[in-house]
Regions:
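Acidic-basic catalytic patches of nuclease active cores, encompassing PD-(D/E)XK
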Residues: 1-34
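Conserved catalytic cores of phosphodiester-cleaving nucleases, focusing on short active-site segments
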Residues: 22, 42-44, 49-60
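An acidic intrinsically disordered interaction segment
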Residues: 28-50, 107-108, 125
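Active-site-adjacent loop/helix micro-motif of nuclease/hydrolase catalytic cores
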Residues: 60-71
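Non-catalytic C-terminal interaction segments of nucleic acid-processing enzymes
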Residues: 65, 112-137
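Short, well-ordered amphipathic alpha-helices
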Residues: 73-79
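Nucleic-acid nuclease catalytic cores
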Residues: 79-118
Length: 137
């Protein structure tokens, strides 16, 4: 068993707002969702699927940095917090659209992706198929 040390992490209001808003969407979509599961941002469960969700704020248009951080954090948390024989499905949540190349990169890593739109949530095909987003990008 690995222990992750407690530390103070500064999170922006954008991050907190994104997590809260998406958590509300998950509840409406009949997921059991948790938003207070430190160090994870969100966890969700529906129909026997457990999802580990990492939320990322895209700062100054730097999608690449946010995507790389999401990949690293999802891999780390899945490894440290879940048994090897009971790994969660993984999803990255962003404050804005990330573009086709990054959607495909995340999919290649087995990670679904989602971001807000004016009228709901868009995402990768995996996210839409799982009910984590309303429409494909």
């Amino acid at each position: 068993m690995q222990t992750i040390s407690a530390r103070v992490i500064k999170k922006s209001r954008k991050h907190e707002t994104l997590v809260k808003r998406y958590g509300a969407f998950l509840a409406e979509a009949k997921f059991s969702a948790g938003t207070n599961v430190h160090p994870r941002d969100l966890v969700a469960r529906r129909a026997g699927d457990d999802w580990l969700i990492e939320a990322k704020v895209i700062r100054r248009g730097n999608v690449s940095h946010a995507v790389r951080e999401a990949i690293g954090q999802l891999a780390t948390y899945a490894f440290l917090l879940y048994p090897a024989d009971s790994q969660p499905r993984r999803m990255a949540l962003f404050t804005e659209a990330i573009g086709d190349v990054y959607v495909r990169l995340l999919s290649h890593q087995g990670i679904a992706s989602v971001w807000p739109t004016e009228d709901g949530w868009a995402g990768s095909p995996e996210a839409v198929n799982a009910g984590l987003a309303q429409k494909e990008a």
